[in-house]
Regions:
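Conserved Walker A/P-loop ATP-binding site and its immediately adjacent core
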Residues: 47, 52-83, 106-112, 221, ...
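Conserved pre-motif I regulatory segment
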Residues: 1-37
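Post-DEXD/H (motif II) to motif III coupling segment of the RecA-like Helicase ATP-binding lobe
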Residues: 216-278
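Conserved helix-turn-beta segment of the N-terminal RecA-like "Helicase ATP-binding" lobe
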Residues: 62, 70-97, 113-128, 257-260
């Protein structure tokens, strides 16, 4: 686009995903597009892609904006390392006062708002006054009747509690700034330094703005940048992110797409792994139980909840002015179709106005075998089955508290309502004027920061050390440096439970893991193992000296470790993060402990091969950034496979005993992973087939077995790498799959062949799948090149799905497999399955094994009956097609009609004889 760039250009070779992305960008630029958005995971080379757009495509002065100084510096480092700059290195930098052909800044540098100022403070004061005079939405109360009393209220607060006054003033300043930026005055609210930076960039003639980690632009930054782009003359805008908007408000999403338009190109993680551009990985989980003290606390909270239910169920009865007990109140509400705004005219109207109450109330009464009022429809079996679930109870209790107890004339009912609300808060439910809301739960906190997690951490590290030896590079990530216990859990959790310091002490507290020479680094603190100090301290001083940084080091002994102190203008997180990361890469320390704020977005250490996630964060943005740390290729270990660990606390006998598992499930909602059968799955099921969307099946009873299986997987990185199928293409179209758990594999295939291998669940389900697929092909329901994939998922679970098929075809196959391996529920046709049973004879017992197999006795016996899938038995002719395939691949046998009187009796006898399948199923979407 411009000749002013001379010989500046990329001096390397783009990866396949970068070639694909850049070709899309080139076409968009040629068509006149000025808004571009590329979505790609951490480690996929977004920085190089952005620089390539600068140097080879746009070739105009460029501004790069990043969320923090570490990422800001990386752009300049990559440009100088990988690009031919035609001796113009001096025009590339991070100084906002000296912009050049490539200027890398933080978002804050051009969006910093005013901290005060006459006009802003005046507007904030007016907004505060207005809020004091506005009736409360819940009860209609007001703090001030007129302007004078509002001003007096604020003046009194300023005099008596200046700290709180300042806090509220800051709150209203922010509201004013947000309002101004939303309505087209974003630049007016900027700090003078931000305005000056924008003016200098305008003078330099910025033609391209690269917005890195642009998922941050949903609020203030995004609103300001929309106007800033206009101020800069509408340059080309390139957004780079691993996580596009998810679950944000409509206005925020609209603002985001005003900047970028729709996604131009998205690169899924599995595609990059299979292309060899990201390291393969496996997600692993280790389960623990709360300690005895923690269990007592959880049990007490549970007991309080049960006593609350008992109190509400046994409440006042026929007492004037009192709200009746829970069941009576619910029945009266349903009988009278009573809602806070008045009675509904009929059931349909009642259900439409409050469907959650209508369904929960019916389910609750029916599950307790209580009669429903006349005219109220009976609930479905599914609703009744969940009649005592937490979802139903919370809905019932919320309406009873808000519409019953709190509207009562009785102060006793009011007190009961407050007691109920406080006990529900312990379980993470807050009853508000608008209904129940999730809130931080003390029980959830105890589960998240359970002390047993530190024992698990040491078990994991020991297993990884045994496998990796001196090549281990472990990173442990927590939410915060220290996580102080709240008053509600004081005495249950240690003072710093859940924090980086606690995890660090846990690693030091074991002789074997202490040999990792761990280092802790957060935004404010650096701690070094006492065994490591003599070796690492000179390295620190050398590193600083080589870079001419103004830093003087000191250290303080803390008992088993040292705190590193630094003085000088360059003692900043971005400098010591780079320094310690380099020591980690070189193996001076083999374990880093830190917070997600520092070791998450933008942090880069390619040698990580063990990541232990002790955070409680569940948003896809944070999770993708965190997990992306371990995906990077390691030039020192081309066969690298990273193990990403979660530690999950379970206490399933209690009401909130699955809280930590639900958090684990949310973490994995948007994560891809490879499964035991080589399929790629998004969601928690890729970690193990027993981990379902509802709850982990059978984990509590066999926790040690699950943990040992996970440790075995951790040791077998070669198998994980093989499962990823590196070099194979990735198909981003999801396939419907069926997972089955049952006891099917017994005996031998009933064929007249010698030396056959006995059926296993895996081989039998594969054979049944082949029979089903071939039948569907013969009837023209699926394409002929489709084939059955799948295999063992561990824990007794098998999976089957259709490869090289459309979404519709894969769904047809999965449904057919669930029918044929499922119960005999009113089947149209059934078919028997025989197996061959082999027994020894007196002669076979005397002969060598190689010869004995020819003299063993064998006979076919009936093993089970199966439903003929509905798609394969629309008529007898179709059923005979299936019968033929079944006979070839599975067993001899004829289809039999089950809808006649005789057939129904016969099916009933089969069930009574225990010859029907008894299976559990999961339906999943997988990628191949």
């Amino acid at each position: 686009m411009s000749d002013g760039f001379g010989k500046i250009g990329f001096s390397g070779t783009l990866r396949p995903s970068q070639v694909a992305s850049s070709s899309i960008i080139r076409k968009e630029l040629e068509s006149g597009s000025r808004e571009l958005l590329i979505v790609a995971p951490p480690g996929s080379g977004k920085t190089v892609l952005g620089l390539y757009v600068w140097s080879d495509l746009v070739r105009l002065p460029t501004l790069v904006l990043s969320p923090n100084s570490a990422i800001q510096a990386q752009w300049v480092e990559r440009a100088k390392e990988l690009f031919h700059l035609d001796d113009r290195e001096s025009e590339i930098g991070t100084d906002p006062e000296n912009p050049g052909i490539l200027t890398s800044l933080t978002y804050q540098s051009v969006t910093l708002p005013k901290r005060g100022g006459g006009e802003l403070d005046e507007s904030a004061m007016e907004l505060w006054i207005s809020s004091l005079m506005t009736p409360d939405l819940n009860d209609g109360s007001v703090e001030a009747d007129d302007r004078e009393s509002a001003l007096a209220w604020i003046a009194d607060l300023r005099e008596k509690n200046f700290e709180y006054y300042s806090d509220r003033m800051g709150h209203y300043r922010k509201k004013v700034r947000d309002s101004l930026s939303e309505h087209g005055n974003a630049l007016w609210i900027l700090h003078e330094s931000a305005k000056a930076n924008l003016k200098r960039l305008l003078e330099v003639g910025v033609g391209l703005v690269i917005l890195d980690e642009c998922h941050h632009l949903m609020d203030h930054w995004g609103r300001v940048l929309i106007e800033a782009m206009e101020f800069l003359g509408n340059p080309v805008v390139l957004g780079l992110t691993a996580t596009p908007p998810e679950g944000a408000s409509n206005s925020s999403v609209d603002q985001y797409f005003d900047l970028f338009g729709e996604v131009d190109y998205e690169v899924p993680v599995p595609a990059l792994v299979r292309d060899g551009n990201l390291a393969p990985y496996q997600d692993l989980a280790y389960f623990v139980r709360p300690s005895p003290g923690e269990l007592r606390y959880i049990a007490n909270v549970d007991e309080d909840f049960k006593s609350l239910l008992g109190e509400l169920k046994g409440g006042a009865e026929n007492v004037k002015g009192r709200t009746p007990k829970l069941e009576v109140w619910i029945a009266r509400v349903l009988d009278g179709l009573i809602l806070p705004a008045g009675r509904a005219k009929d059931w349909n109207s009642f259900h439409r106005r409050d469907p959650r109450l209508a369904d929960a109330a019916r389910a609750y009464l029916a599950s307790g075998e209580l009669n429903l009022p006349e005219g109220v429809p009976q609930p479905s079996a599914e609703l009744v089955a969940g009649g005592n679930s937490m979802d139903v109870l919370i809905t019932i209790l919320d309406r009873y508290i808000r519409n019953g107890l709190m509207r009562s004339e009785s102060e006793e009912d009011h007190a009961l309502a407050e007691d109920a609300k406080s006990k529900l808060r312990m379980l993470g439910v807050q009853i508000t004027g608008g209904g129940p809301r999730l809130c931080a739960s003390p029980v959830g906190r105890v589960m998240a920061y359970a002390s047993a997690k530190y024992d698990a951490l040491r078990d994991i590290l020991r297993a990884e050390m045994e496998t990796l030896g001196p090549d281990i590079r472990a990173v442990i990530v927590t939410d915060f440096e220290k996580t102080s216990a709240t008053a509600l859990v004081e005495g249950v959790l240690d003072d710093d439970a859940g924090g980086a310091v606690a995890a660090y002490r846990a690693v030091l507290g074991c002789e074997s893991t202490d040999r990792l020479d761990p280092v802790l680094m957060t935004g404010t603190t650096v701690l070094v193992d006492d065994d490591l100090l003599e070796r690492i301290f000179p390295r620190f001083e050398q590193w600083v000296s080589e870079r001419n940084l103004n830093i003087k080091f000191d250290y303080i002994e803390r008992g088993g470790y040292f705190e590193i102190r630094g003085k000088g203008k360059d003692w900043l997180p971005r400098h010591y993060t780079m320094m310690i990361t380099e020591m980690f890469q070189d193996g001076v320390t083999k374990c880093l402990v830190g917070t997600r704020g520092l070791l998450g977005e933008g942090w880069d250490a390619s040698r990580i091969n063990v990541l232990v996630d002790l955070t409680t964060v569940t948003t896809s943005m944070s999770i993708n950034q965190l997990r992306g740390r371990s995906f990077r290729l390691d030039k020192h270990w081309p066969e690298k496979v990273a193990n990403n660990w979660d530690i999950v606390c379970l206490a399933d006998e209690f009401t909130k005993g699955f809280d930590d598992y639900l958090r684990f499930k949310r973490k994995h909602k948007q994560l891809y992973g490879v499964c035991d059968d080589g399929a790629i799955e998004k969601g928690v099921g890729h970690v193990h087939a027993a981990f379902t969307e509802a709850e982990p099946e059978g984990v509590s009873e066999t926790m040690e077995i699950f943990n040992e299986e996970m440790l075995m997987r951790a040791r077998n990185r070669g198998r994980a790498r093989e499962l990823w199928g590196i070099g194979q293409p990735f198909n981003a179209v999801p396939r419907e799959a069926i997972e089955i758990k049952g006891s099917f594999g017994e005996g031998f295939p009933p064929a007249n062949r010698i030396g056959l291998v006995a059926w296993s669940d895996e081989s039998l389900i594969q054979a049944i799948g082949d029979a089903v697929a071939c039948s569907l092909q013969a009837l023209g329901l699926i394409r002929f090149d489709a084939k059955v994939g799948g295999g063992s998922r561990g824990g007794g679970w098998m999976r089957a799905y259709l490869e090289d098929a459309s979404e519709e075809e894969s769904e047809i196959f999965a449904e057919a497999m669930q029918e044929i391996l499922g119960p005999l529920d009113n089947p149209r046709y059934v078919i028997p399955r025989e197996v061959k049973v082999v027994s020894e004879t007196w002669l076979s017992e005397m002969l060598p094994k190689v010869i004995a197999k020819y003299f063993r006795r064998s006979e076919n016996i009936l093993s089970m009956y199966h439903v003929v899938p509905s798609k394969l038995c629309r008529n007898l002719e179709d059923a005979k097609v299936f019968e033929q395939q079944w006979n070839w691949k599975v067993s001899p046998g004829e289809v039999m009609y089950g809808h006649s009187k005789k057939g129904k009796e016969w099916v009933s006898e089969i069930k009574m004889a225990g010859l029907a399948p008894k299976s559990s199923f999961h339906r999943k979407s997988v990628f191949t």
